[in-house]
């Protein structure tokens, strides 16, 4: 029977094994991460475009004597994003804020 190394050596070996595992790329994970990166780039571009369009709508509405925002419209946006759960509502509020700025500021 082989004697076990002291506890601190076990911890060092475990840490070395973990480092080796983490440094070895897993092709499927790398591919999925690349897809996430592409999706993030698309999402960012769409969010920026959404904010631009929203600001243009606000300017046009104000120029024609309307209000800065339409509450019922914003509620429809929040309702749409609520499909994603509670975080969806938060996401909708952030998107609305990006398009018009914070209310009262």
Swiss-Prot record:
Residues that coordinate or bind chorismate: 61, 70, 74
Catalytic activity annotation: chorismate = prephenate
Enzyme Commission number: 5.4.99.5
One annotated GO biological process: chorismate metabolic process
Ranges for domain Chorismate mutase: 23-105
Activity regulation as described: The formation of the complex with AroG activates the chorismate mutase activity by more than two orders of magnitude to a catalytic efficiency (kcat/Km) typical for chorismate mutase. This activation is primarily caused by a more than 30-fold-decreased Km value, but also by a four-fold increase in kcat. The activity of the complex is inhibited by phenylalanine and tyrosine by about 70 and 40%, respectively.
Cellular component aspect of the GO annotation: cytoplasm; plasma membrane
Site for Important for catalysis, residues: 61
Broad class of the protein's primary localization: cytoplasm
Compartments in which it is found: Cytoplasm
GO molecular function, one term: chorismate mutase activity
Record's keyword annotation contains Isomerase: yes
InterPro entries named in the record: Chorismate_II_sf, Chorismate_mutase-related, Chorismate_mutase_highGC-bac, CM_dom_sf, CM_II_prokaryot
Annotated keywords: Amino-acid biosynthesis, Aromatic amino acid biosynthesis, Cytoplasm, Isomerase
Site features described as Important for activation via AroG, chain residue numbers: 101-103
One matching Pfam family: CM_2
Pathway named in the protein's UniProt entry: Metabolic intermediate biosynthesis; prephenate biosynthesis; prephenate from chorismate: step 1/1
PANTHER family: CHORISMATE MUTASE
Function: Catalyzes the Claisen rearrangement of chorismate to prephenate. Probably involved in the aromatic amino acid biosynthesis.
Summary of subunit composition and partner proteins: Homodimer. Interacts with AroG.
Name listed for the protein in its UniProt record: Intracellular chorismate mutase
């Amino acid at each position: 029977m082989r004697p076990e190394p002291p506890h601190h050596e076990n911890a060092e070996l475990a840490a070395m094994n973990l480092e080796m595992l983490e440094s070895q790329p897993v092709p499927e994970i790398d591919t999925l991460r690349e897809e996430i990166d592409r999706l993030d780039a698309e999402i960012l571009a769409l969010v920026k475009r959404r904010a631009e369009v929203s600001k243009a709508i606000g300017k046009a509405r104000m120029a024609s004597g309307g209000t800065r925002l339409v509450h019922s419209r914003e509620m429809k946006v929040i309702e749409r994003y609520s499909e994603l759960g509670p975080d969806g509502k938060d996401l909708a509020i952030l998107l609305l804020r990006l398009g018009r700025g914070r209310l009262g500021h």
